Amino acid sequence: MSDIALSISMLSLVAVLGLWLGNWRVYGVGLGIGGVLFGGIIVGHFAGLSGLALDEQTLHFIQEFGLILFVYTIGIQVGPGFFSSLRSSGLKLNGFAALLVLLGCAVAAALHQLFDVPLPVILGVFSGAVTNTPSLGAGQQILAELGAAPGSTGLMGMGYAVAYPFGICGILLTMWLIRMFFRIKIDEEAAQFEQQAGKTKESLQTINIAVRNPNIHGLMLSEIPSLDEADVICSRLKRGDELMVPRPDSRIELGDLLHLVGERHALRKVLLVLGEEVETSLSTRGTDLRVERVVVTNEQVLGKKIRDLDIKQKYDVVISRLNRAGIELVPTSQTSLQFGDILNLVGRLDAIEAVTNVVGNVQQKLQQVQMLPVFIGIGLGVLLGSIPFYLPGFPAALKLGLAGGPLVVALILSRIGSIGKLYWFMPPSANLALREIGIVLFLAVVGFKSGAGFIDTLINGDGPAWMMYGVAITLIPLLVVGVLARLYGKMNYLTLCGLLAGSMTDPPALAFANGMHPTSGASALSYATVYPLVMFLRIISPQLLAILLWAGA
């Protein structure tokens, strides 16, 4: 059997064993995708005993490519809501994340001083305890720059391997402990997040208004200031017994009934200008008007503004709502269309069919993955992650790495939506499949590599002490920040789980958190919100620790 065939066969065995272990549940809690790590340790241990060795280059490629797939698909998933989340809660989330990193550094420095732990060992344990591979690389590089002994990098690697498994388990344990201590109900937390995110009760509102203001009489719809604003849409007009679709040049008369769509505060402002709210129904039922939902799939309209399509004038159809990535938006004339946008159309059936032909509404396209943008995004992400950033006073350059680069690029591209005929939309099922494959590959290799020397390190020498140092570095910051964020920050539990996973740059923990409520994007959103800053801090922190502790030695 060739080296590549043997490597793939062994990793498949690791995945099967690990996923089986992950399905075991104790009191309703299981390892989930994290079981693959322990499947890898078990298989790696017995492979080491039998003298079986896999090709290092193949393993390294599979590990890194799996990680790239995982973080890229996470970025594509949360990108549309990432920047709005950053504006609304980014400061709070990143503040807690920075505190967690700072506490971890403080615990590591204290252990080094109190127990006289060698600097390479504590740096390796620190990197493993926070499950951050770039941190390990940065630490090894700074030790070489400082002139440490040649065996220092090996010591760091051993410390990393010993601390890494509990680094993952510690996050899962912290999530479980917080859930038990605060008696949290997952479904209630998910519903609360949806409400706060504006996806349920706080979504767009509708109101029927009777025109009572004589100053409005005779004005065209486009001449009424309150209706010309970007946050209110007039989708229906009833005059007497006739229900019609209003056009910008439609003249308003006293007694007209208008059906408006918008945010609650905007509708209240319009109500004060136009007249009074009425209970009269403006339903299209029994009339020649229809309300239909169509999906934007036509590549020709991607990136175009609604005003450029001139739908109101050409087809006498109003777009009353726009749903993008589960969030309802007011479809203004300045809104650019993206692939997968869901439009609410109001108009006559033949006119709606004409607009449908313009925007696409081909359901099969929603199940297809455009592969060219995927590899463009991954390639750009790898390039960004490889760019060195030089800071004054640091002997080594800083990089986002293969985990940070693809994530940042995916966030930006999914927010842009489309460029020409290229669109960064991925069906949820395809996104989930690629994400799960990526994290399984990554964990399988990490576990397999750690398995060979794992038991020996634990049983002989200082292995148990190193593991306890790792436990302290993992648990103390997580528990302190977790309790503070929940108790004083009043943070949603699913958001908190994403914060903890992101603060430890731990994809398996995010996969575990996502599994608690698969339909909620709360954990992934907070993970992506803190990840860029945390990755930067995780790369800097071992270098700062090395410089400070080396100087104090």
UniProtKB/Swiss-Prot annotation:
Q: Name one GO cellular component term.
A: plasma membrane
Could you tell me which residue ranges the RCK C-terminal domain spans?
Answer: 191-276, 279-361
Cellular compartment(s): Cell membrane
What Gene Ontology terms for biological process does this UniProt record contain? potassium ion transport
- Tell me which UniProt keywords the record has, alphabetically: Cell membrane, Membrane, Repeat, Transmembrane, Transmembrane helix, Transport
TM region positions: 4-24, 29-49, 65-85, 95-115, 158-178, 371-391, 403-425, 439-459, 465-485, 493-513, 533-553
**Family classification:** Belongs to the AAE transporter (TC 2.A.81) family. YidE subfamily.
Q: What protein is this chain from?
A: Putative transport protein AHA_3492
What species is given as this protein's source?
Answer: Aeromonas hydrophila subsp. hydrophila (strain ATCC 7966 / DSM 30187 / BCRC 13018 / CCUG 14551 / JCM 1027 / KCTC 2358 / NCIMB 9240 / NCTC 8049)
